[in-house]
A protein has these predicted regions:
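Metal-dependent amide/peptide-bond hydrolase catalytic core
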Residues: 1-137
């Protein structure tokens, strides 16, 4: 149909406050267009899928500490920085199991130049084995 269009967006942010601000921005834009063109011209559906795991992981610094130890033991220099990606870890963190993101060997995610390095994937595997050992002690 020529007279219809749809758009889908994924809202992500490190900050829950900024995350909510972005949703309010979409609501305000919807209200503006509805006011200008009338009811039924635009429809906004918001569905929260997950939140950034930071607020669920930060209270448990030992989780990050062990991850860093496991990486170092695998010969990897840890780089601790926030990411906005949606992962199973975000969902698990909100279910009560704090799960920070770890590396997997992939680069340039979600684009035509995405790839995985076998060497880095092996380092990721060794990191997981090291985590099992560290948490098992």
């Amino acid at each position: 149909e020529v007279e219809n269009a749809s758009s889908e967006y994924i809202i992500r942010d490190h900050s829950r406050v900024k995350f909510e601000e972005k949703k309010r921005y979409l609501q305000a834009a919807t209200a503006l267009l509805t006011g200008k063109y009338g009811e039924g011209v635009i429809k906004l559906t918001l569905k929260d899928q997950y939140y950034n795991m930071r607020e669920m992981v930060e209270p448990y610094p030992e989780v990050i500490d062990k991850a860093c130890q496991a990486m170092e033991k695998a010969g990897v220099t840890p780089i601790v920085r926030p990411i906005r990606g949606g992962t199973d870890g975000a969902r698990l963190s909100y279910m009560g199991l704090p799960c920070p993101n770890l590396f997997t060997g992939g680069m340039n995610f979600h684009g035509k130049y995405e790839y995985c390095s076998l060497n880095t994937m092996q380092k990721a595997m060794q990191t997981i084995l090291n985590l099992i050992e560290l948490w098992g002690k």
